[in-house]
């Protein structure tokens, strides 16, 4: 194990974060895995150590809590770990009518999706700048490009991630730090989301991907310096449609989508109003 640098991944214990961790380990990257306290993080750590010749540091941290980002940065600094890749993956999603969502849900969603990503990027930036090449991958969403009922706050937080990443990339364009934003569509990251995704219409089902299929595209795009990474042919097709369709037609489509969302979906009880960790 000659590599002495580390890739830090937040929301790493399950779903997309777990897939990211395994993909990075398969590329001989040492890992700092950050996730909520629980057995999943330790299971993943042991799995990677058994199967890959990389070093793995597991840090339990609830990034919704005040001072948690500073505590994480301090812990990494105390361990004298050199981070050359930061993947801000942790986030909270939800599918709920805005008026039915709790204040606590929206507060946590904004803290984790927006504030934690911003603060961790700021805290680790000087560390990243010490390397010959460093990378920041912020996990956004296709939701940042569309007006989605029941996902108003989630979509808004991902719009922030999109514009924050693009602006920071421009600011750091002459430095050694490369910034990319990943904008996936729906992903089958847990059982409830898998069931709900299968209950969608034909086009929405075509756009859904498994985390294991997204992560190679994400890491390849990051290492190749791609600014915006949109995995999947169908998702790229949707982006093309969004550019060429008149607003009037998009409003009609959104209205039809609202009617479908207003119908009772047997799987939304697993998703709302409680938050779903997007990892």
Name each model feature, range by range.
Residues 11-14:
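Conserved glycine-rich cofactor-binding loop
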Residues 27-44:
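Conserved glycine-rich Rossmann-like NAD(P)H-binding loop of the short-chain dehydrogenase/reductase
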Residues 89-94:
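Conserved NAD(P)H cofactor-binding loop of Rossmann-fold oxidoreductase domains
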Residues 97-110:
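Substrate-binding pocket helix/loop in short-chain dehydrogenase/reductase
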Residues 121, 157:
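Active-site helix of classical SDR
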Residues 141:
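Residue(s) in the substrate-gating loop at a strand-loop-helix junction
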Residues 181, 202-239:
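C-terminal helical subdomain
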């Amino acid at each position: 194990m000659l590599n002495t640098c580390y890739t830090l991944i937040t929301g790493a214990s399950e779903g997309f974060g777990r897939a990211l961790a395994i993909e990075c380990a398969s590329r001989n990257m040492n890992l700092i895995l950050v996730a909520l306290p629980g057995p999943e993080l330790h299971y993943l750590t042991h799995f990677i150590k058994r199967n890959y010749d990389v070093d793995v540091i597991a840090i339990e941290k609830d990034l919704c809590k005040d001072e948690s980002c500073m505590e994480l940065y301090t812990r990494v600094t105390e361990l004298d770990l050199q981070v050359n890749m930061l993947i801000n993956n942790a986030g909270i999603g939800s599918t709920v009518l805005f008026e039915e969502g709790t204040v606590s849900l929206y507060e946590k969603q904004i803290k984790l999706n927006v504030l934690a990503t911003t603060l961790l990027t700021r805290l680790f930036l000087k560390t990243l700048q010490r390397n010959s090449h460093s990378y920041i991958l912020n996990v956004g969403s296709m939701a940042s490009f569309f007006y989605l009922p029941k996902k108003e706050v989630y979509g808004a937080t991902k719009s922030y991630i999109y514009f924050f990443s693009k602006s920071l990339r421009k600011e750091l364009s002459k430095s050694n730090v490369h910034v990319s934003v990943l904008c996936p569509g729906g992903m089958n990251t847990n059982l409830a989301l898998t069931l709900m995704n299968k209950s969608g219409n034909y086009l929405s089902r075509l756009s859904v991907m498994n985390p294991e299929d997204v992560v190679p595209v994400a890491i390849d795009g990051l290492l190749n310096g791609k600014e915006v990474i949109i995995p999947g042919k169908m998702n790229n097709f949707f982006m093309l449609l969004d550019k060429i369709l008149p607003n009037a037609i998009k409003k009609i489509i959104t209205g039809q989508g609202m009617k479908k969302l207003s119908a009772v979906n047997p799987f939304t009880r697993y998703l709302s109003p409680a938050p779903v960790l997007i990892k």
